[in-house]
A protein has these predicted regions:
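General beta-strand structural signal in soluble alpha/beta enzymes
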Residues: 50-55, 73-75, 148, 171-172, ...
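Short, solvent-exposed amphipathic alpha-helical segments in soluble enzyme
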Residues: 163-165, 254-259, 280-281, 338-341, ...
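Core active-site phosphate/anionic-ligand binding loop and the adjoining beta-turn-alpha structural block
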Residues: 190-192, 222-443
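Catalytic cofactor-binding cores of redox enzymes
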Residues: 9, 90, 97-100, 121, ...
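Catalytic or ion-translocation cores adjacent to nucleophile or general acid/base/metal-coordination motifs
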Residues: 101-107, 111-121, 128, 142-145, ...
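Short polybasic linear motifs
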Residues: 196-198, 202-206
């Protein structure tokens, strides 16, 4: 119940009054009557009962066991032949279904931090792969201009992730309030809008102009481009948000013959109606047009997506490193007639899959006490549990956790009262940290011991994104270009949900359409509570071993040598050796 409410905290959700958490229209509950009924049922639920939630509506309570999940959630699921955006929208209008995104409808969204480390891992790997021996960056993005679009709940992680990886970020969004929110939460350094500039350090808007000596235009876009190019040349890891449509930004860069080093996009193209904003409209105009003529709006939206991807491919031809960041924009452009839409790769096959082969993925935890000190204690213990010298990934974990702190030396000394977050917690204090098979269970048991000993004030909730090593089938994202061609097989996501139910997760969810839109993905999530009891310890051991093990099973079966080696090293039981 606390996590459901946390999803709708005004500091967490994008539009809490509409029950929208993030990702266009990803909701926590179908409507307010359903929300109230869920809360009332959870209050009276017995330890051996399980609540069933169908697309954000509580539909039944069944007798189970104390080791069974307290809640089972199914969101947005449709029989494949009818799994289209059009059918979904009709059912949603009738109040029969809800879009759960990934962590919105599964009650484990923790704000932009939830995707931050994964975004950092992506951009850091991009630097290592493409700039390891050139430009003096030492395999980082130092001195590199990284351009992207979409600064919402997910895309808003990009500016901070890029700067943490050493780069300069230029990001466009049509919604000025999103850019201002990211500045407030210290994910974004500066904003340029309507010819004015401000930063987190300067609250008053100040006039800013483009360099008229270099070009005639004096728009905000030109001013933002000039500023970002200058920062990159100076090697400054700063981020600039420009209030503009991403299409306009990219086309202006083409006009000015400016090629970014890295280019991607996280606009809400997974949802052509309520997410993406066509280039013809401002953010405010788009809201009106959706209501006036939804069919025309979708046509304009997909046409803009084609134009968007064409600009990305043109910049790729000019030398930019371009990758798709999982919003399905390539598919939308392809469906609209652009045959070269898949010219650039997705981020998972390009940078992340080697980690999936090891059962690594986005492990997150939340302090139910609401006290940031509890997170600082867990950070400190995580650094002890996984020494830096243990592996390259442990070293990265140390850099990541310390990078989350404004005063890392205070954390290292165990002076928790002197710790401050580098970026703001949203809602309940939380942390994200990528861990693999053989690590997640250790962390979970350690958290349980902290609760038991009283070193933290209240239980800790442990969950993850549905974007994980063995929990999703998404041919245009997580399972793109699988070695054996099994991209579209969703048995694995279903098995993941069943394994987590059998293992004793506190709540388990199975969704359709997260990240890339209706018809393009199926995925499972799990959450488990460390309450300090011996019974919880047994569940934690099972769940946090079996959940990442599904990633090793999945990738070993697909023929990945790293996954097979991981299975052998950790004595994973695979009946038919790959």
């Amino acid at each position: 119940m606390r996590m459901l409410m946390n999803n709708l905290d005004p500091d967490v959700a994008e539009h809490p009054d509409k029950l929208i958490v993030y990702g266009g229209r990803g909701q926590a509950a179908r409507d307010w009557a359903s929300f109230d009924a869920i809360v009332e049922t959870l209050r009276r639920l017995k330890p051996d009962q399980t609540l069933l939630v169908q697309s954000g509506k509580p539909v039944g309570v069944v007798s189970t066991t104390e080791d069974s999940p307290r809640v089972l959630i199914a969101n947005s699921n449709l029989v494949p032949h009818w799994g289209t955006q059009e059918v979904f929208d009709e059912l949603a209008k009738k109040g029969l279904i809800m879009y759960g995104q990934m962590t919105a409808g599964s009650w484990i969204y923790i704000g932009t931090q939830g995707i931050l480390q994964g975004t950092f891992e992506t951009f850091a790997e991009c630097g290592r792969v493409h700039f390891g021996s050139t430009g003096g960056g030492g395999g980082t993005l130092k001195g590199r201009l990284c351009v992207t679009g979409g600064c919402g709940g997910m895309g808003g992680a990009q500016p901070l992730a890029i700067t943490l990886a050493g780069g300069t970020c230029l990001i466009a969004d049509t919604d000025l309030s999103r850019l201002e929110r990211r500045v407030r939460d210290r994910y974004l350094d500066e904003v340029i809008a309507d010819g004015k500039w401000r930063s987190g350090e300067v609250e008053e808007w100040q006039s800013v102009k483009a360099d008229a000596s270099k070009h005639s235009a004096t728009s905000s876009i030109d001013a933002a481009i000039d500023r970002a190019v200058a920062y990159a040349k100076q090697g400054k890891n700063l981020s600039i948000g420009v209030h503009a449509n991403a299409v306009e930004l990219l086309e202006r860069m083409l006009e000015r013959n400016i090629t970014p080093d890295v280019l991607t996009d996280q606009t809400s193209s997974h949802d052509p109606l309520t997410g993406y904003v066509p280039v013809e409209f401002t953010h405010e105009q788009a809201a009106l047009e959706r209501e006036r003529d939804a069919k025309r709006y979708v046509e304009l939206s997909t046409a803009s997506m084609e134009r968007h991807v064409r600009a990305m491919v043109r910049l790729q031809d000019r030398g930019a490193i371009v990758f798709d960041y999982g919003n399905n924009i390539r598919q939308r452009a392809l469906d609209h007639g652009f045959r070269d839409a898949f010219r650039f790769p997705g981020f998972v096959p390009a940078y992340i899959r080697p980690q999936f082969c090891l059962g690594r993925g986005p492990f997150r935890w939340v302090a139910l006490s609401g006290d940031p000190r509890d997170i600082y204690v867990t950070d400190y213990e995580m650094l002890k549990l996984f020494p830096r010298e243990e592996s390259e990934y442990s070293s990265r974990m140390h850099d990541w956790i310390l990078g989350c702190h404004k005063h890392p030396e205070a954390l290292l000394a165990g002076k928790f009262d002197e710790c401050e977050p580098r970026f703001a917690f949203q809602g309940l204090p939380a942390r994200i940290c990528w861990l693999g098979l053989g690590q997640r269970d250790k962390a979970g048991l350690m958290f349980n011991d902290l609760v038991k000993s009283g070193r933290v004030k209240a239980p800790i909730v442990i969950g993850r994104d549905h974007l994980d090593c063995g929990s999703v089938a998404s041919p245009n994202r997580e399972t793109e270009a699988m070695k054996d061609g099994s991209d579209a097989i969703s048995d694995w996501a279903i098995l993941n949900a069943m394994v987590n139910i059998a293992s004793g997760s506190s709540w388990v969810s199975f969704h359709h359409g997260g990240g890339v839109g209706i018809g393009f993905s199926q995925h499972a999530g799990q959450v488990i509570v460390a309450d300090g009891t011996d019974a919880a310890a047994k569940r934690l051991k099972r769940v946090l071993t079996n959940d990442p093990m599904m990633g090793v099973f999945r990738h070993a079966d697909a023929g990945y040598a790293d996954a097979a080696a991981c299975a052998k090293r950790l004595n994973v039981d695979i009946p038919m050796t790959p």
